[in-house]
């Protein structure tokens, strides 16, 4: 009787493990779904880490109580290798070679002036000045909140070329500060009340390079929504509430992803068209407001390399407020560039985002 009960229990647990893997796979490849057609299904990527962790707990259980069963979660990770690596990559440590340029993308939360000050004592301004980056792309960067008489000359000395866009409108303010000449710039047009993307054409060591700075549509989750998501992830919410709140969260997420998808498509089309017509390389960065398991990420990954996936390590959470930890800030590059040592720098906490950094080396013979 005891053996039968044990066998039955192990089969039930094995079945639950298989079900977890199936859900993990479905969510992991949900980025292939066009949000315009199925917005709810395309929004479930936010829940991917939950099933990633559940499968890990199954692995621990099997190792402790029936080691042969460990094959189930291990096979699960193998078949879900692509989304798992996209979400939490691991790479050999790489040292940026001589001649590599350093790119920094940072949603600066309008420089968090309440906590950081308005002058050179502002922690975010100080971080940028001491970053050593060659190209700095900022989102939510309303410069007028700073003491520009004090800050502007110092920024100009470190970064002689810059463009600040959107400071005098209701839209987000995007900025670029760079050591390279800016040949021209233009806005990539798409529908949005406040978000935007800008294309800059830089002269990097005699070659024209397209740099695109993005701040795509926000998910518009309030503090209560974020607290509930945190409770779902931590498992402190009862099952009935989990179902109810998950549906409500998915409703908000699906509304945002439906707006965001055509924005990403416009940017992807712009980059592809420009590269074909002008034969130039591209660097794309910004706050995507989407996780690595998303249509936005999948669309831009079709013709570009995610620098963090290619050279970073760990989940690289770039948003870190209100109990939500997700990687929504990105740096991508075209095939002419090789990324090195991408990282999300969690040492500066003034903004609700951490900056993402990567070194890029121009390849002499791209594939």
What are these regions (language model features)?
Residues 9-64, 71-75, 186-188, 261-283, ...:
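Metal-dependent phosphoester-hydrolase catalytic domains
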Residues 27, 73, 77-98, 115-116, ...:
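Structured beta-strand-rich core segments of catalytic domains in phosphoester-bond hydrolases
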Residues 102-108, 120, 124-148, 165, ...:
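Active-site beta-strand/loop signature of hydrolases that rely on acidic residues for catalysis
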Residues 105-121, 143, 220-256:
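Acidic/histidine-rich helix-loop elements
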Residues 109-111, 183, 217-218, 306, ...:
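Active-site/binding-pocket entry motifs
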Residues 111, 144, 219, 290, ...:
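Surface-exposed, flexible loop/turn segments at secondary-structure boundaries
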């Amino acid at each position: 009787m005891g053996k039968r009960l044990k066998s039955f229990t192990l089969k039930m647990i094995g079945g639950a493990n298989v079900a977890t893997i199936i859900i993990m796979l479905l969510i992991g490849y949900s980025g292939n779904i066009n949000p315009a057609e199925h917005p709810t299904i395309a929004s479930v990527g936010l829940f991917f880490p939950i099933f990633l962790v559940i499968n890990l707990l199954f692995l621990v259980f099997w190792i402790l109580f029936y080691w042969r069963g460990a094959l189930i979660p291990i096979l699960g990770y193998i078949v879900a290798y692509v989304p798992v690596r996209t979400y939490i990559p691991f790479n050999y440590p790489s040292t940026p070679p001589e001649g590599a340029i350093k790119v920094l993308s940072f949603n600066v939360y309008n420089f968090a002036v309440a906590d950081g000050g308005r002058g050179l004592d502002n922690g975010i301004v100080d971080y940028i000045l001491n970053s050593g980056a060659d190209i700095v792309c900022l989102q939510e960067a309303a410069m007028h909140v700073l003491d520009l008489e004090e800050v502007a000359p110092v920024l100009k000395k470190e970064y002689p070329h810059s463009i600040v866009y959107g400071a005098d409108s209701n839209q987000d303010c995007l900025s670029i500060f760079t050591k390279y000449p800016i040949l021209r710039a233009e806005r990539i047009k798409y529908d949005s009340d406040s978000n935007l993307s800008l294309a800059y054409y830089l002269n990097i060591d005699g070659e024209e390079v397209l740099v695109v700075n993005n701040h795509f549509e926000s998910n518009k989750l309030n503090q209560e929504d974020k607290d509930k998501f945190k409770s779902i992830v931590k498992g402190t919410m009862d099952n009935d509430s989990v179902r109810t709140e998950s549906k409500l969260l998915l409703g908000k997420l699906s509304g945002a992803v439906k707006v965001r998808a055509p924005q990403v498509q416009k940017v992807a089309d712009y980059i592809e068209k420009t590269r074909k017509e002008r034969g130039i390389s591209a660097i794309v960065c910004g706050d995507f407001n989407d996780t690595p398991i998303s249509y936005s990420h999948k669309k831009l990954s079709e013709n570009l390399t995610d620098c963090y996936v290619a050279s970073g390590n760990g989940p690289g959470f770039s948003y870190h407020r209100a109990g939500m930890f997700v990687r929504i800030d990105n740096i991508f590059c075209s095939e002419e560039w090789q990324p090195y040592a991408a990282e999300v720098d969690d040492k500066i906490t003034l903004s609700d985002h951490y900056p993402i950094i990567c070194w890029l080396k121009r390849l002499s013979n791209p594939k």
